[in-house]
Amino acid sequence: MSAEVHRDRWGIPHLRADSALALARAQGRNAATDRAWQIETERHRAQGTSAAFLGPEAVGWDRFARRARLADTARRCYAQLDADTAEWVGAYTEGVNAGLAESAGDAAEFAATGLEPGSWQPWTPLAVWLSTHILFAQFPAKLWREEVAAALGDRAVDLFAADGPHTAGSNGWLVTGERTASGAPILAGDPHRFIEAPGVYQQVHLACPEFDVAGLAVPGIPGVAHFGHASTVAWSITNAMADYQDLYRERLRRTGAGVEAFGPDGWEPATSHTETIEVAGGEPVTVEVTETARGPVVVGGPDAPSAISLRYPPRVTGELGFDAMASLLRARTVDDVDRALDRWAEPVNVVQAADTRGGLLHRVAGAVPVRDRANGLRAVPAWETRYAWRS
């Protein structure tokens, strides 16, 4: 299987191959060629190993990534992919590894930090995706409200229950053909992201006998997930700002058999093990990784005065939405986009799409659990059935 790469006068890569798998390998190789330092940094962040070359300032994130079980969750989600999607993602990582071996040495950052490019596993893109989006929902705000309650009292929490009067965020525009001079619909996506160098997106054109798509790819992730144009249909997203992660106040204790957590039915086993974070220019840091029936403990622990666990959909369901990414590339109409997004999970997005037949789509895509309204404000008691997810 062969592939070819052409760069236009703006340096945008146009990749063409004789099969979808060969194209995935070419896209992975191109990501490694153009963004080697970026994707390797994201891999280490997802695995909780970035302090090994970034130093003590990265320990905080590495500790969270390990305690939240980001890499382990990615492995679970990869194991549940359908066979075709798993092969597609695997082909992409093969390309990444080939590209890193060929050209990563050209990136000055590797020489400056002494970092040697590592090996991507088939599940690594899922870990990078999860790590990139784990803070997109509301659990950081819930942690903030816990701090408010501790400092100012429970009555002050309602003062921080909503955003302020100023608006912010991405926007998307979807105009029916009935309101345009051409009679065709207009779609415009306007993502508002932090200014980063390199940017969070990479313009790319992907073509093979099965599809022909141009758009914005996320380096380290196969396909064109967020903003794409596939000849007869186009799609774009904004963050839905949905609340789909919950925090639980846990009661933990050590026993001769390990760690237990107090749940709705009393004391129950929790898993616990230790991991070591290597730190450039510092001493190694030992982290205890504990998980209850609600989710991984991300604040406190068995020996701390309190503990808080994080429950997030991919950890519960083993679904991250990569099956949707492969289907999006093959979309021809807004109905195809709609069906593909039924498999979307993380993060929760607002999606707009339009096609050349005049079709329009505006929907929310992603996994949002059904639970008590109180879960949306702050951490809730793990031992009360009322706060359990109902679906």
Model features per residue range: what roles?
Residues 2-197, 209, 215-216, 221-224, ...:
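Substrate-recognition/specificity elements adjacent to catalytic centers across diverse enzyme folds
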Residues 97-105, 330, 342-346:
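Sec-exported extracytoplasmic/periplasmic mature domains
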Residues 153, 212-283, 325-330:
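Compact, glycine/acidic-enriched structural inserts
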Residues 169, 217-218, 303-309, 316-325:
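Flexible glycine/proline-enriched surface loops and loop-helix/loop-strand junctions
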Residues 82, 95, 168-174, 208-226, ...:
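Short alpha-helical segments and helix-capping/turn motifs at coil-helix boundaries
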Residues 84, 321-343:
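Alpha/propeptide regions of enzymes that mature by internal proteolysis
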Residues 219, 346-391:
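Hydrophobic alpha-helical segments
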Residues 16, 23-26, 183-184, 195-199, ...:
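Short helix/loop capping segments that flank catalytic or ligand/cofactor-binding pockets
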